Amino acid sequence: MEIERKWMVTGWPEGLPLEEEFTMRQGYISVQPTVRIREEALTGGSTDYILCFKSAGGLAREEIERSIDKDLFVQLEEKIIGKPLIKKVRRSYRLPDGAVLEVNHVDEGLPTAFWYAEVEYPTVEAALRWQPEACGLAAYLNNEVTNQPGQSMGAYWAQTRG
């Protein structure tokens, strides 16, 4: 189960310790239900290829991820998807309460480029209880879109590549 809240933001946060950075490319075989491939390249580290399935939902939804090899990723990208993949840079920051803030810059340089941030939680109750103010992020995380239709990466794919 994936339990996360999402906010639209305007850049990288200031004053938080950077844990890691990934350069990603992702594409969708299907938007409903979500069937996605993703290439995740850790800055200074390894590259992973992931096939992901997600159920419908906002705050909480089922998610199944499986590692795939590069050859299968390329075949799915070229022969099944056949469209330019979404490019993302993701930076992860450890928050004072121990949670991790993931900030994403999507399709940098394109007219449709945007930023968003997510925090994942162990339970729905923890997600509903968590407040950005508690970590000094009230000004940064002030535009929550967790349960708003059209705010998923799948919706962005459909709008820009569909």
Model-derived features with residue positions:
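Phosphate-end processing signature that detects enzymes handling 5′-triphosphorylated RNA
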Residues: 1-162
